[in-house]
Amino acid sequence: QTFQYSRGWTN
């Protein structure tokens, strides 16, 4: 998982 600014958690 990575955290993207103003988008939330994505795989």
Curated annotation (Swiss-Prot):
Chain positions with Asparagine amide modification: 11
GO BP, sorted A to Z: neuropeptide signaling pathway
Alphabetical keyword list: Amidation, Neuropeptide, Pyrrolidone carboxylic acid, Secreted
One cellular-component annotation, GO: extracellular region
Tissue specificity note: In larvae, both corazonin and corazonin(3-11) are expressed in the CNS but not the midgut or thoracic perisympathetic organs (tPSO) and abdominal perisympathetic organs (aPSO). Corazonin is expressed in the ring gland (at protein level). In adults, corazonin is expressed in brain, cardiaca, corpora allata and thoracic-abdominal ganglion (at protein level).
Protein localization: Secreted
Modification Pyrrolidone carboxylic acid occurs at: 1
Family assignment from sequence similarity: Belongs to the corazonin family.
Stated role: Cardioactive peptide. Corazonin is probably involved in the physiological regulation of the heart beat.
Name of the molecule in the record: Corazonin
Organism, scientific name: Delia radicum (Cabbage root fly)
